[in-house]
């Protein structure tokens, strides 16, 4: 049986690498991988036109995920303009597309509170408005194996494990922490299920404190002064289960995820 052609951007990123690993294990797909340096080619626009024309499905995972990047032109180019180009080509050739968005789109009171959030929000809104076969997945706080290269953008679990101590913001901020395996399964879920075009949330539907994560890891912590809290900082994020894809549910609890992650980190020192 011939394999389906699948185009995946962000092939060297945290989520992209894990998605590829999962798809390779299924052995149903011929995956064309695009990484960031692809766009440095003088002819990348024609090349991607050809790739999209010849593929069956697009997983657009690649992005500038650095929420600390304040360069408007750089962030909007990578997260909006490149996405818009891909979405337009997907529409031209009538291709299904799954777009990796972010809970940063929810921001505060339903609107993004930082540049990264606005760039992803603009991209998903353009995609859903112009493509009939478009699914955006708003990932919440993803952690797990494969995020080692992310540096300051890696999860609190990874950073705390490496430092053996951690400084937290005061006032009890909470996040919806979701294990990478659940995110991978959500990302490929539309491939195997008839999911309507739309914007969906990928989290657990539970908010957990950073203190709880560190306590599960037996990591010591202290607190920053309130004066260092960034403007627009989100103190709570939690996915709305009503916004999950039909029949998709996360399977890994925080306790299970942290245990598996620590085992992985110990084995890969």
PLM segments and residue spans:
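C-terminal substrate-binding subdomain of Rossmann-fold SDR/epimerase-dehydratase oxidoreductases
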Residues: 162-269
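NAD(P)-dependent short-chain dehydrogenase/reductase
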Residues: 115-117, 121, 125-175, 180-184, ...
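Conserved Rossmann-fold NAD(P)-dependent oxidoreductase catalytic core, especially the SDR/UDP-sugar
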Residues: 60, 84-116, 135
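Active-site segment of SDR-like NAD(P)-dependent oxidoreductases
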Residues: 12, 64-66, 102-107, 113, ...
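N-terminal Rossmann NAD(P)H-binding glycine-rich loop of SDR-like oxidoreductase domains
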Residues: 6-24
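Rossmann-fold scaffold of SDR-type NAD(P)-dependent oxidoreductases
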Residues: 9, 55-61, 99, 201
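Glycine-rich NAD(P)-binding loop of the Rossmann-fold in SDR/ketoreductase-type enzymes
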Residues: 73-85, 114, 118-119
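NAD(P)H-binding glycine-rich loop region in Rossmannoid oxidoreductase-like domains
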Residues: 42-78, 104-107
């Amino acid at each position: 049986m011939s394999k389906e052609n699948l185009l995946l951007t962000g092939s060297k990123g945290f989520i992209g690498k894990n998605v590829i690993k999962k798809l390779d294990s299924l052995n149903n797909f011929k995956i064309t991988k695009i990484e960031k340096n692809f766009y440095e080619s003088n002819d990348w626009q024609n090349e991607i036109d050809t790739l999209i024309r010849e593929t069956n499905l697009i997983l657009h995972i690649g992005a500038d995920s650095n929420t600390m990047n304040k360069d408007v032109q750089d962030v909007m180019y990578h997260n909006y303009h490149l996405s818009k180009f891909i979405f337009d080509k997907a529409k031209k050739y009538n291709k299904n597309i799954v777009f990796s968005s972010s809970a940063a789109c929810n921001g505060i009171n339903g609107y993004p509170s930082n540049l990264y959030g606005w760039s992803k929000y603009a991209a998903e809104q353009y995609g859903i408005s112009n493509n009939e076969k478009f699914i955006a997945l708003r990932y919440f706080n993803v952690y797990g194996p494969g995020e080692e290269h992310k540096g300051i953008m890696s999860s609190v679990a990874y950073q705390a494990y490496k430092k053996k101590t951690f400084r937290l913001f005061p006032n009890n901020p909470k996040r919806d922490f979701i294990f990478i395996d659940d995110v991978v399964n959500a990302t490929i879920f539309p491939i195997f299920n008839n999911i309507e075009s739309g914007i969906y949330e990928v989290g657990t539907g539970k908010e957990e404190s950073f203190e709880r994560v560190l306590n599960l890891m037996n990591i010591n912590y202290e607190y920053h002064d309130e004066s260092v809290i960034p403007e627009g900082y989100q103190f709570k994020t939690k996915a709305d289960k009503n916004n999950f894809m039909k029949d998709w549910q996360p399977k890994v609890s925080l306790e299970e995820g942290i245990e598996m992650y620590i085992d992985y980190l110990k084995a890969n020192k």
